[in-house]
Amino acid sequence: VASLVGSEMCIRDRCMPGGKIAVYTGMLEVTKNTNGLAAVMGHEIAHAVAKHSVERASRGAILNTGTQLLDIFTGGKLSQVNRATGMDTIGLLSQLGIMNPFTRKQESEADYLGMIFSSLSGYDIRETTKIWERMKEFNKGKSQPEFLSTHPSADNRIKKINEWTNKIILEYPPIKIS
C-alpha cells in the first residue's frame, strides 16, 4: 500500500512495518518525473520485500538484551547515575558501531534492489543518480558525517549507483508483457 502524504515542507519517503509506503509531496520536487518517482518507490518497495523493519527491530531487541545483561552482571549495584551513564554509553556505542552501519547497509541494499525493480518495470534508472545529486544540493551544509547517520552519504550513494547502473540495465531489462 502506497500513500502520497500532503506536506510540501517534508522531502521524505519511508517504508513502515507491514510494508506500507509513504511519499511526502515535498519529495516530488526532488523526483521531478515518473522515472524519479519510480526510483523512490522501488527503493521503498525493496525495504518492504527485504523486511528491513523486522531486521532492525530484531537487532534492536538483541542490543537491548545486552544492556540488560550489563545490569545483571553488575548485580544492580551501580548507582542510578552510573547505571544511566553506562546504559547511555552502551546505547551510543551500539548505535554508532552496530546499528548505523547495519542500517546504512540496508539502505544500500534497498538502493540496489529498488533500481532492479524500477528497471524491470521499464523505468529509466539513470534518473536515480540525478535524484541523489538534487538531494545533495538540497541538503548542502545540513548533512552530518556518515558514521553518525543511518544512511550512506549522498556522495557514496551516487558513486555506488553509478557503479550499478549499466550492469542493472543489461541484466534486468524491462519485463515484456504480451
Where are the regions that the model predicts?
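Single conserved hydrophobic/aromatic residue that forms the stacking wall/gate
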Residues: 1-6, 10-11
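Extracytoplasmic
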Residues: 7-8, 16-20, 32-34, 112, ...
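Active-site His/Glu-centered metal-binding helix of metallohydrolases
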Residues: 10, 41-53, 109, 113
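Short pre-active-site segment immediately N-terminal to the catalytic Zn-binding motif
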Residues: 22-39
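Catalytic Zn2+-binding segment of zinc metalloproteases
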Residues: 34-36, 45-61, 74-77
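Membrane-active amphipathic alpha-helices enriched in small hydrophobic residues
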Residues: 58-77, 86-98
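Short helix/loop segments within enzyme catalytic domains
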Residues: 84-148, 174-177
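Catalytic and substrate-binding regions of cell-wall glycan-acting enzymes that process beta-1,4-linked
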Residues: 141-164
